[in-house]
Structure formats: C-alpha cells, structure tokens
Amino acid sequence: METIPYDKRTGKIWFNAKLTDWKDAKVHLLNHGLHYASCVFEGERVYDGEIFKLEEHTERLFYSAKRMGMEMPYNQDEINKACKEIILTQKVRDGYVRPVVWRGSEMMAISAQKNKIHVAVAAWEWGSYFDPKLKLKGIKLNISSWRRPAPNSVPWDTKAAGLYMICTLSKHEAESKGYTDSLMLDHDGNVAEATGANIFFKDSNGTLHTPIPDSFLDGITRRCIIDIAKSSGIKVIERKIKPEEMSNFEGCFLTGTAAEVTPVSQIDNFSFNVCEVIKQLSKSYHNLVRKKVAA
C-alpha cells in the first residue's frame, strides 16, 4: 500500500516547544545528528487516543540522552505533555508517536560541546508494523551476517540512532531474499534480537525462553509480555541461547512497540508453530493496551 512520504504530510509537529507546521519542521543539512549520529529517539504506540506506557518511554528517552552526553532542555513532564498535545492536535486515535532529540549545527566536528540540543515530537496514524496476514501465520526471518556490537563498544542500552545502521542493513538483506525480518546474533554468536524487536521461544513444556538483554535494549513490550506470562502461570527463563538450540523450540515470537506480539514461523532452516500460548499472549497484550478486561 502506498503511503504519503513523511516530509509531505500535513498538520503540526511539536518542535522545540512550539507547534510548527509539518512542512516547516526542518533542520540544517550541517547538523551533528545527521553527520555523527548525535541523536536519540523513542517510538510510542497510541491506542484509542492514549499513548501506551508514555512515562516509561519518556524515562528511557532521557536516559538515552544522558548516556549520549545530551542535556535535555525540557523536563520529563514537559515531554509527556508535548506527546499528549501532539496526538490531540493531529487527532491520532490509533497510531505512532516519535520523540527525537539531536545536536544542532553550532560545531561540525567530532566534538560537539557547544551544540544546541533540539527536541521534536511527531505523531501519525499507523497500523500494523508487519502485514496482518503474515502475522496470522507467522513471519519468516533469516539470520543476519551483522551482529550486535560488544557492550563495551557502544552505548547498547540506549535508543540511539547510530545503533540502527546495522539493523537497516540486516533488514534490507533479509527482504531482498524474501524474508520479512532478520535475526541478529550478539558479539559472541548467541541469539540476540530481530532488527527492531525482542525475541521469545516456547519449548514443548510451555516454558518461554528469551535472551538476556546485555547487548541490546530490554524492550518495554518485552517486559510487559514477561509480566503477562508470569501472571498467567507461564515460566519465563532469561538466558543465553545458541542458534542451534532453535531446533528444540516449538514456538517463536517477536515483541516490540511497533511489532506488538508477532508470531514467527521460520528462522533460516528452523520452523515454528503459531501455537495457542502465543495467540493467548497476543490477545492478553491487546487487552492490556486497549484497557479491555480479558475474557
């Protein structure tokens, strides 16, 4: 389905504390965020006109900025208010919110101590990240040739723009080969995550296994699913998982703000079933974000 390019849309964007016309929300070509990846961001879902886990996302945004040496010009309450304001202004009922923080253009070199910190928040209507028909039968992943960097080489626990370069490379490679997404291994060759989502496996006993987030983000949706599973009596084990262990699992799914709960039917040569446990977790998550009482 064709979508309107993001620089051609209409409405307002919250830009440095002002509601700015969408077409006028611009930055200079020579900004540090573009050239040196001095940029952090968040992705938030809107359900029935409310942002799910807004405060947690804002806390992570501020943590990411601090880790990148960026002093936020606004406090968390102001950013929360900005996120709520922009979805009302844009009349977003079921969509996406993108807060983004970047260094400006005062200095153009590796050093950036004098650069102004800019903040913007945009919102738009947005449906499923993956094709809904594919989600019903499970998406297919390859195994990326790129790996998540060692934790002592990057600020791995941030949502920083530069960390997604290898994700784009991995996803493009996967799509060129007919896959929907790509599984990334960590620096030691263990299962890590997909390009923009965490991963879970289900064994024959109904236990869930998920990698320890020690070189990639411990996703907000990931934590929600762990809580839902445990409250439903499902055992969850966080541990290192070798790729060859995937032959022992019956089910697999991804979690993320964009991905929500997405079943996986294949990773490379490993096959999985879209089992009842995964369907129930997806339903429970849907009920949670929509504030519905589980049946």
What are these regions (language model features)?
Residues 80-107, 124:
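Short, acidic/charged, Gly/Pro-enriched secondary-structure junctions
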